Amino acid sequence: LTGKEKNIEADFIFSTVQTISKEDVFKSFNDTHFDEIIIDEVHRAGADSYLRLMDYFKPTFYLGMTASPDRTDSFNIYELFNNNIVYEVRLKEAMENSLLCPFHYFGISDLEVDGKVIDELSEFSNLVSNERVEHIISKINYYGYSGDRVKGLVFCSSKQEAKVLSEEFNARGYNTTSLTGEDSQERREQEIAKLVANNGDMLDYIFTVDIFNEGVDIPEVNQVIMLRPTQSSIVFIQQLGRGLRKSANKDFVVIIDFIANYKNNFLIPVALSGDNSYDKDTVRKFLSQGTRYIPGMSTIHFDEISKQRIYSAIDNVKLNTWLFVTDEYNKLKNKLGRIPTYSDFENYDAIDVRKIFEVAGSYYSFLTKKEKQFKYSGKLTKTAENMLNFVSTNLILSKKI
């Protein structure tokens, strides 16, 4: 279905949500017209347009597909499908099964400008200074790419940074452009076509902020450059994933992450490892031995300054706050559709249950505070609860469950 094509009698109908969510379009079908409905990028299904369609249509079978089911806005996607997870594959498993292109990740230190390390509060002039531009170009040339020519995506921290850096690259002989949410879909497709072309009007790089985090498929990308702070492990993997599609004449993708003095730097090893336990010792170990944990030919390397910046972020971050722990708990609860058991935290690679002990004393105490519907046969006396808290915090915390 498109704005011009309305062949509603076809056996298979493909449509964007923008088109089919229009009332005059979806109501041209009976609510039981479709036997099966497949929704791609289903993590967006919390939007009114998706919910309107799912409320209307009553197919025999709904299938949702997404690379990031755990949304950053806490909407429970799993609940839309009765918590029925047919198949789940994470980065490590995908690499083990050769579903993705091998990658070489380089975490390198971003530049100090006038003796100051770039961070979230850095002045814009420092982000686009000649010194930083030359530093970026030097590193991307050094680490290279696979293929006859570079076809790169550059993720920036703001629209203005993307625009100015693109101009600076062009002034130095590169052919680049910047794309933001303000650009039409037509222009985006035109620029992507130039990026993947092997002759004629070609682009070396597209500078952007977040419009390519999801919903775009450019297998030819052979270099991904990260020039922004890591806000979440979900976004990190989304941006990393832009280069992981297999393509002819691409043996691997190069990921170059410019690591400044960002407070969320600890999320980088968390995202790469896929370890959601948030155990600080585990995160530190991955930082020095990351390549050992990634299957196949992929490699992970951090330079010494980047390591120190990430170690510092690990030391400073508080992973035992009530807000953080309840957020991670809710992710697992949403996936299961019920209150998790002890073993669920390990079986589903969720947060280390010891983090819960640290904030609440014991899992029992946590649930009595967090879950109104939590019922335990024979409520513990205060003395018994205190004893359980003592065992949890003093004995169990001394070793991994």
Predicted regions and their residues:
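Conserved interdomain linker/interface between the two RecA-like ATPase lobes of SF2 helicase motors
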Residues: 85-156
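Post-DEXD/H (motif II) to motif III coupling segment of the RecA-like Helicase ATP-binding lobe
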Residues: 36, 43-105
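Conserved segment of the helicase C-terminal RecA-like domain
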Residues: 233-238, 242-276
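Conserved helix/coil segment N-terminal to the catalytic DExD/H
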Residues: 3-36, 47-52
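Conserved helicase ATPase core of P-loop NTP-dependent helicases/translocases
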Residues: 1-9, 25, 163-165, 174-212
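Structural recognition of the conserved hydrophobic beta-strand(s) that form the central parallel beta-sheet
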Residues: 13-16, 60-67, 205-206
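Long, largely alpha-helical accessory region at the distal end of helicase-like NTP-driven motors
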Residues: 147, 158, 268-400
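A short beta-strand element within the Helicase C-terminal
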Residues: 204-229, 235-238, 242, 253-258
